[in-house]
């Protein structure tokens, strides 16, 4: 482990750094313009990431992104069987997400998400906060589980939600103007407050 390492790590274009532990690069910032691969990693990644490269979660990785990644404009890739979780907007920065695994968003605050989220993976909403999606952030095709708080659609025109299955759990809420592509299951205690669904 490099837990005491506290210097900047720079990943150049066409270069790759592969980690099998969240403390593999210590506590320092990561300037990623290449490829940072998390391979069979579990735990909290507290490093702050910047740059325009790719962060790839592979081989059953399950990582919580805790760093201030506000300056990261690259891409998070979540492979099948892997998972990333975030709590705040700064954890995703301005990056896009290709999600073929599981993305968990646990927020206690309101968050208007403008990130592009695509892929066949699932999204789980936890926490009491309101997560507002647009067409780009609602482009993923996997299952949506609203376990806590609310997923809202704030546009005057209907947002196209590509998710094939939507589960609104007890205390979960879905609201706004939305056109859905798949089936919807509102469980006891869940609430659906939408202007339009198909």
Where is each model-derived feature located?
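Residue-level recognition of the GNAT/N-acetyltransferase active site
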Residues: 58
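Surface-exposed loop/turn positions within long extracellular repeat scaffolds
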Residues: 1-34, 39-52, 64-101, 106-120, ...
